[in-house]
Amino acid sequence: MVIKWNDKYSCYDETIDLQHKKLIEMINEINEIAELDDGIDRYDEIVKIFEGLKDYAVYHFGYEEKMFAETGYDSFNTKIQQLEHKGFVKKIESINLYDLDENQIGTVKDLLDFLSKWLDHHILVVDLKFGEFLKEKDAGLL
């Protein structure tokens, strides 16, 4: 289930869009491993990718939340964003390393299902609200 960047994901902020592209690229790396399904132990590689994804997501979420504060984004939508960001990180951190070691492909596929659904919802619903806010602000409508 490769995720391809599409303009529908654009949040009207070049930096956020570039960061979303990077997150998609990292999720697609995980997908490549899941598609191999060749019986080779890739535990260390998978853990490294998961840790990189978590670290990059924390960096990205920090950037977004800083933007919310700097642009005067409303507190209700900021809180929704923060809760979703925390949920994402918590999910990555909750991966049971024993389960991963025992069932690499199954664990990776389960996480991919979560990641693809979360990313689609988060960007297309939650982040696009912020993108629309930025667009209106730039147009002088706010």
Where are the language model's segments positioned?
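Small-residue-biased structural context
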Residues: M1-L142
